[in-house]
A protein has these predicted regions:
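Short glycine-/aliphatic-rich beta-strand segments at the starts of folded cytosolic domains
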Residues: 13-41
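Short beta-strand-to-loop capping motifs
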Residues: 23-25, 73-77
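Charge-rich, low-aromatic oligomerization/scaffolding segments with amphipathic character
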Residues: 80-92
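Conserved short beta-strand edge segments in small beta-sheet-based binding/regulatory domains
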Residues: 94-97
Length: 97
């Protein structure tokens, strides 16, 4: 159970490999969060840090920026965004039935 998160994936027309994921839930407060790797995610409780840990564990990500309800991902060359929507959508799920 938990709050279901709806996610809209928007590919940048001007920057190939950059994808915005807009959610119906806030991921941060007023601040911006920048991640170059999983080591930048310091908290096990902060939603943005948890998301960063999960996305970098998935692989294929060079950079992540999270602000408000938007996560912007720069994909590594040769990788697709497959599976990222599911990771974000499951962020606030504590268990599945």
């Amino acid at each position: 159970m938990g709050q279901p998160v709806r996610v809209a994936e928007k590919i940048s027309p001007s920057s190939p490999g950059t994808i915005r994921f807009e959610t119906n839930r806030p991921l941060t407060g007023m601040g911006h969060c920048y991640y170059h790797g999983a080591e930048d995610a310091l908290s096990d409780e902060d939603p943005a840090d948890v998301l960063a840990s999960r996305l970098f564990a998935r692989g294929g990500i060079d950079y992540l920026h999270v602000h408000g309800n938007v996560a912007t991902v720069d994909l590594s060359k040769g990788y697709t965004s497959e599976g990222i929507v599911d990771i974000i959508a499951g962020l606030f799920a504590h268990y599945e039935i």
